[in-house]
Structure formats: C-alpha cells, structure tokens
Amino acid sequence: MSEEKIPLIGEKFPEMEVITTHGKIKLPDYYQGKWFVLFSHPGDFTPVCTTEFYSFAKKYEEFKKLNTELIGLSVDSNISHIEWVMWIEKNLKVEIPFPIIADPMGNVAKRLGMIHAESSTSTVRAVFIVDDKGIVRLIMYYPMEIGRNIDEILRSIRALQLVDKSGVVIPANWPNNELIGNKVINPPPRTVKDAKLRINQPFDWWFTYKEI
C-alpha cells in the first residue's frame, strides 16, 4: 500500500480498511453521501495535538452542519488513542465524538504522504478534505510545531461547497475579503462575446464579482 501514488486533489480517495477507536472502518465508503476531514497528528499525549483535538471536538457540530465528519490518525496504537481520548474527556471535559485511526505500522500514513523528512516515523499535521463523492478536494500540511487553524478548515469546506453549488470562485480571506467583502468572483469568461458583456463591470471584464 505504501508504494502506491499519493492521492492528489481531484482524485478518488484510496480505498482502505482501517482500525479506529470506533471499530473497523472502510474508507471512503463509510462516509458515503457525506464529506469528511481526515487529519493526522504526530502523537497522542502531546500538548499541541491535545489543543487541536479539543478544538475539533468543540467545533464538531459546525462540521456536522456542513454534512461533514471528522476522522483522526496517528501512528500510535488503538489502546493509546483510547487512553488519550479518555484523558481528554476526564480532564478537559469534552467528548471526542469522532474516530481516530490507529496506524502503528505507518502504512496508511505513508499511503497518504503524511510522513515527511523531519521525521521518519511520526506523521506531520496533514489534512485531507474529501467530498460526498469520495473525491479529494483539498490537502493541507502543517509542520509538527504548529497547530492547525480549525476555522480555516471550516472556511475551506464552506467555500468548496459553495463552488459546487454556484459555480463561482472564492477570493482571499473570504468572507472578509479586503476588496469585495463577502462577495464571490465570477469564473473567467469562456468567449470574446462573454468578455465584452463584462467590459463595464468593476473591476474589469476579467475580474467581476457578485452577491451570493
């Protein structure tokens, strides 16, 4: 499995059966009809990872409102995951409602390109956003030293779902873009005729936007 090509944006998420804190799960079929975020962390019982899991848990309902589930992963054992989840619930008073993949041999992590040069064994902080058709839509990598921005992951899902629904493209820092606020950008014109119809629109024919 580790010798196969790492999935890219726009490709089908690879089929795999994994052991998790919620039992065996077959991906991506387990989340058929839903989006899911698969995120890796370097290790259980580590401070930065604990802050991330706390934040994911606190915002879990926001993900669910977007028809999106969460699933974690590290190269720790399932027993380690279970002990860590129980520690978080007892000491931080928050339930971890999503499964965590146990990947002690690193096969899943290698298949998904989560083992980077700074460590030959531990996973970096990778994020795969997969849509309701099992297609990889976004990939992020954070170094071990920096915790993820969970709001940015939520923003990315909202943006991707809006792109699918409305056929628009999304500006920087949306929905608080410095030029156009919460508006979205029209895709480039496909013909000269379409371009001429946009000549008098701000900012120019190649840069038009609208309310959504």
From Swiss-Prot:
Cellular compartments per GO CC: cytosol
GO biological process, one term: response to oxidative stress
Positions bound to substrate: R125
Compartments, record wording: Cytoplasm
InterPro entries: AhpC/TSA (IPR000866), Peroxiredoxin (IPR050217), Peroxiredoxin_AhpC-typ (IPR024706), Peroxiredoxin_C (IPR019479), Peroxiredoxin_TDXH (IPR022915), PRX_1cys (IPR045020), Thioredoxin-like_sf (IPR036249), Thioredoxin_domain (IPR013766)
Keyword terms, alphabetized: Antioxidant, Cytoplasm, Oxidoreductase, Peroxidase, Redox-active center
Catalyses which reaction(s): a hydroperoxide + [thioredoxin]-dithiol = an alcohol + [thioredoxin]-disulfide + H2O
Principal subcellular localization: cytoplasm
Keyword Cytoplasm annotated: yes
EC number: 1.11.1.24
GO molecular function, one term: thioredoxin peroxidase activity
Gene3D superfamilies for the chain: Antioxidant, Horf6, Chain A, domain2, Glutaredoxin
Active-site residues per Swiss-Prot or TrEMBL entry: C49 (cysteine sulfenic acid (-soh) intermediate)
Thioredoxin domain location: 7-162
Enzyme class: oxidoreductase
The family this protein is said to belong to: Belongs to the peroxiredoxin family. Prx6 subfamily.
Biological role stated in the UniProt entry: Thiol-specific peroxidase that catalyzes the reduction of hydrogen peroxide and organic hydroperoxides to water and alcohols, respectively. Plays a role in cell protection against oxidative stress by detoxifying peroxides.
Subunit structure, as described in the record: Homodecamer. Pentamer of dimers that assemble into a ring structure.
Something else known: The active site is a conserved redox-active cysteine residue, the peroxidatic cysteine (C(P)), which makes the nucleophilic attack on the peroxide substrate. The peroxide oxidizes the C(P)-SH to cysteine sulfenic acid (C(P)-SOH), which then reacts with another cysteine residue, the resolving cysteine (C(R)), to form a disulfide bridge. The disulfide is subsequently reduced by an appropriate electron donor to complete the catalytic cycle. In this 1-Cys peroxiredoxin, no C(R) is present and C(P) instead forms a disulfide with a cysteine from another protein or with a small thiol molecule.
Record's protein name: Peroxiredoxin 2
Source organism of the structure: Sulfurisphaera tokodaii (strain DSM 16993 / JCM 10545 / NBRC 100140 / 7)
